[in-house]
């Protein structure tokens, strides 16, 4: 996710924005001195904790709302992702993911109340497939990524020299891998990747 104004762009804002929304913050100023938000632990939890540590101040200005009055569907250019927004009297979010992967296939997550966000969603980490890492690094992305701040999914067999090369791109030491799965499990929830997409 990228925010832009004129020539200025900042990316990977979604963890912070989710935390702000969950905490009820709709007006704040955040200074960033890089083109990418810090990944921290790969979740929204550090942002929630920071907001909780200072609290939220109610302002006298009236809050502006966007009211959903009809179904809206947004689809990515490649057609692989979509978001459907439906009018309702209560807030809820459902996320469904479907990857062509023997490790991460179909998953589903639901959030019926923002009161559940901190305990059920905020700590769910971002994830990446080993087979995509080299391409992401070459594109100048995942600059702060490592085994401590993302679930790393190993779903396509590779020999150790290939894994060593990928790790070198990240400035990391490659783990010794003997089977397909999550390189840095265990998962916090069986559907942690879907919960992260919900975030």
Locate the predicted segments by residue.
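Short acidic-hydrophobic catalytic motif
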Residues: 1-199
């Amino acid at each position: 996710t990228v925010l832009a104004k004129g020539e200025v762009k900042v990316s990977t804002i979604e963890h912070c924005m989710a935390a702000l929304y969950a905490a009820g913050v709709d007006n704040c100023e955040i200074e960033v001195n890089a083109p990418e938000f810090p990944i921290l632990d790969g979740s929204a939890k550090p942002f929630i904790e920071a907001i909780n540590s200072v609290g939220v101040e109610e302002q006298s200005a009236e809050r502006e709302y966007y009211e959903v009055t009809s179904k809206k569907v947004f689809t990515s250019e490649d057609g692989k992702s979509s978001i459907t927004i439906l009018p309702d009297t209560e807030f809820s979010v459902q996320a469904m993911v479907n990857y062509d992967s023997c490790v991460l296939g179909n998953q589903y997550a639901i959030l019926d109340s923002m009161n559940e966000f901190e305990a059920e969603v905020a700590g769910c980490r971002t994830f990446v497939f080993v087979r995509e890492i080299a391409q992401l690094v070459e594109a100048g992305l995942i600059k702060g990524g490592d085994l401590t701040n993302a679930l790393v999914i190993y779903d396509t067999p590779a020999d150790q020299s290939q894994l060593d090369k990928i790790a070198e791109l990240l400035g990391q030491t490659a783990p010794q891998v003997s089977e397909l799965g999550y390189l840095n499990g265990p998962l916090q929830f069986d559907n942690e990747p879907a919960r992260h997409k919900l975030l």
